[in-house]
Amino acid sequence: MPALRRAAALAAAAQPVLPGANRVPGAASATAPLVSFSTPLLFMKALLLAGLLAGAGAPAALAQTPNLPPVKTTSFRADTLSILKYGAVADGQTLNTESFRKAIDACTQAGGGVVLVPRGLWLTGPIVLKNNVNLHLAKGALVQFSANRADYPLIKTNWEGLDAVRNLSPLYGADLENIAITGQGTFDGAGDAWRPVKKSKLNETQWDKLVASGGALNAKKDTWYPSEQSLKASTMDKPGVLTASKTDIKDFADVKDFLRPNMLSLTRCKRVLLQGFTIQNSPAWTIHPLLCDDIIIRGVTAKNPWYGQNTDALDLESCRNGIVEDCVFDVGDDGICIKSGRDEQGRKRGVPTENFLFRNDKVYHAHGGFVIGSEMSGGARNLYVQNCTFMGTDVGLRFKTARGRGGVVENIFVDGVDMTDIAGQAILFDMYYAAKDPVPLKGESTAPPEMKAEPLGEGTPQFRSFFIKNVTCKGAETAILVRGLPEMAIKDISIENAVLEADKGLVCQEAENIRLKNVTILSKETKPVLEIQNARDITLDNIRYASGAEVLLRVSGERTKNVKVSNTNTKSAKKDVEMGANAPKKAVSITKS
């Protein structure tokens, strides 16, 4: 028990070192303590939290927690340099790119410190971060990035898990250590100058106004592009991706307008703090750490238009060791998203995203609240989600992949998620992801194609060892959808202590060792409440549902076997089990409570 008390004390006391007698006002935020541990999982979490938050001074026993090393925190000199000293003008008209560059260069050359952005409207081109610099936005500071695409040079970088050429990100850093962006100001990425827009995502007035602003329409007149060059590039196959025949930046000059940058891009950086600010109107992904270690993201708000294509809030790609807490996301694509490279390139890189804690985060509009995939070819593991809230997302917990991705996703722990008004699935495991919106647009379908088993290979993805408990959802299209591949079942999923209100209940296909315990499913459609197809070793323990359901459980598929129902009042349904096509007669056993 002394170790637990020490873990709690460390978790309560630890916080990143910030400037201003070493602190800038408003930049610090205390970490909530842990006070009790009633299960082995909570014991693991205590060690995780202590390790993540304690830093280099943690006792050796905690630092040695398997696969959960401590997060190393940032530390800065108290010296503060204002961008005003370097000629910046807050009139919303003067381009302050050089002033930001000079201030950041002077700060890093002096050994580091704080670059202060005072209150005001600051127009600028891209800002390139440097070692040992904390870029701090005062309350009321608005950094407006230029809408002139010519202000952003092309660079070699990464796009959706592949080596590619893109425009330089508005906020950019590579191969840095000990960096921060803090404060209570706002960054605006001028995303409307970059993004295509689908007609189906706007009302008539909005669409007419957008078309009248200029740009170009595709042949079907259902997608708007900011320029003719952007439209032309949209018809090409992976126009920004580096290939054997296109290896130089100049090879991509004719499609520059199409190559949207991610808004905040950090590559191969160590000891990163992002805290307190608002970041909005991104051209593409909003916050994208790639191959970064030791990341703390605290109290950050990301806001993008709901129609914004690819405007994920946070994409952690092949990153290790961090905490994301008290953040608020309201965007046009995924909310919190875990990635690790795409297909062969991701597998060759072989760096999973691992050892992260996500807690007390809120996601409003997004394709998914907490998401893994689909670009997860390097794998993901040891991720903890605690006490998060999703309101109005398309999917709540969204785990997506597809054939060809490869990668292993494992050891995912979720404890405490509340959801309302989920348009699609509250909990989704899907190996049929096809880069479509999770909620079909008019004329689209999300039904999986008929697929036969294929030989296993390095491109076969794997989902296994997920532990989900204490989840509530008030309103969804489907409570739980588990959809594996014929050649690779989704395995070892535990869902416990959940109350899920949805139109449909459970759909489980191509899965193995799935366990539901103390789960209430309040579905409008009750024929059936639970549907299992080609799945094995399914445990349904103390399942509650609305009285008078037509069919509690339907099973089908010749590979279905060992479905066990226990501690469940099967008499509340008009029919307890319905055997569908090709289902073995002894596939289901019911233990009366």
Where in the sequence are the language-model features?
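N-terminal polybasic/positive-inside topogenic patches
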Residues: 2-3, 8-22, 26-35
